[in-house]
Design a protein with these regions (language model features):
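Structural motif
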Residues: 4-6, 139, 222
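Donor-binding and catalytic core of enzymes assembling or modifying cell-surface/extracellular glycoconjugates
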Residues: 17, 155-251
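Short acidic-hydrophobic, aromatic-tinged amphipathic segments that line or gate anion-handling sites
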Residues: 54-59, 204-206, 262-268
Length: 309
């Protein structure tokens, strides 16, 4: 008797979103496999999916082992350990497909987030309140930091150089807040000039539900981010984005072939590949330490990219 499969998906929500096309293909190509997905990092973005929602389980689900795992083979896909990924031949969604489906490098569909009425209305209410508070009609969501960011006293640092430098993103926000209702998507508050904030307020809502954040991005006019979750939400919502890449390669972590994505690669020609989830070397992060330091010209380029949308 052939056993079905229990796939274990770990990591952040961006990885979950990028896994969706691979699982859709697996379901289509393996109709006899009654597979499940064990969500070690949460099942938020399997929710609402027409077929995958019923296959997804939080890893604390009661009876998960005895009722669902015990009679299945366990598989843990790791896209960062796929040859095509760490040699810059594919993106994250394709790496999941290679690892899960074993069909080699091929084109995969776009992920999709399925929001319900409550999520849409709640996000629309948040955005409308911010528009009224700022007096601006156009809304820009800014995600300045990736998940590797750390705080040390008053300092905000990303040792992997995937995030904006604090002084750079503050400069960018100070320019764009005069033209847009800006919503900062960050668990870490961004320190802005208080006197200017009274004239040009910037919203920093603490929204714990990532699905609400995805709906906020959907309602907004544009997204500005780095190597972080938000851009994968934008892709799954068919939105527009300006993405700044430094220590990571656009082909791996973003969508350079999507005309709705304007990717400004400030690390081009300067970075080396950091073997995330492969080794614990620190040499690469040290080499990449300054790749996200922006020049005045690059800051102008970023602001102009946002204005195009």
């Amino acid at each position: 008797m052939t056993r079905s499969t229990a796939f274990f998906i770990n990591g952040g929500a961006g990885r979950v979103i990028c896994s969706l096309p691979a699982f859709e293909l697996y379901e289509k190509e393996n109709p006899d496999d009654d597979f499940i997905i064990v969500c070690e990092g949460g099942m938020d973005f399997y929710k609402g999916h027409p077929t995958l929602h019923n296959r997804a389980y939080d890893h604390w689900h009661k009876g998960l082992f005895e009722e669902h795992i015990k009679d299945r083979n366990c598989v843990t896909p790791e896209p960062y350990r796929v040859w095509e990924y760490y040699n810059q031949k594919c993106d994250l969604a394709q790496a999941f497909d290679i690892d899960i489906n074993n069909k080699g490098l091929r084109k995969v569909g776009d992920p999709k987030i399925y929001a319900n009425k409550q999520e849409i209305v709640q996000a629309a209410t948040i955005v409308e309140e911010i528009k009224q508070g700022t007096g601006k009609d156009k809304v820009l969501v800014v995600q300045p930091f990736g998940r590797t960011t750390e705080t040390h006293g008053d300092f905000i640092v990303d040792p992997t150089s995937r995030s904006f430098q604090l002084n750079n993103i503050v400069d960018i926000i100070n320019v764009l807040k005069k033209e847009y209702a800006i919503i900062i998507m960050s668990e870490i508050p961004v320190p802005l000039e208080e006197t200017e904030n009274k004239q040009y307020p910037v919203a920093q809502p603490q929204i714990p539900d990532l699905r609400i954040w995805s709906s906020v991005i959907d309602v907004a006019d544009h997204f500005l981010g780095c190597d972080s979750l938000g851009q994968h939400m934008v892709k799954a919502l068919d939105g527009t984005a300006t993405i700044i890449t430094g220590s990571t390669y656009p082909i791996n972590i973003s969508y350079p072939d999507d005309p709705k994505f304007d990717i400004i690669d400030v690390g081009d020609g300067k970075r080396v590949y950091a073997p995330i989830r492969l080794t614990m070397e620190e040499e690469q992060d040290r080499h990449n330490d300054e790749v996200m330091e922006l020049t005045t010209k690059q800051i102008d380029e970023i602001c102009n990219s946002v204005r195009k949308h």
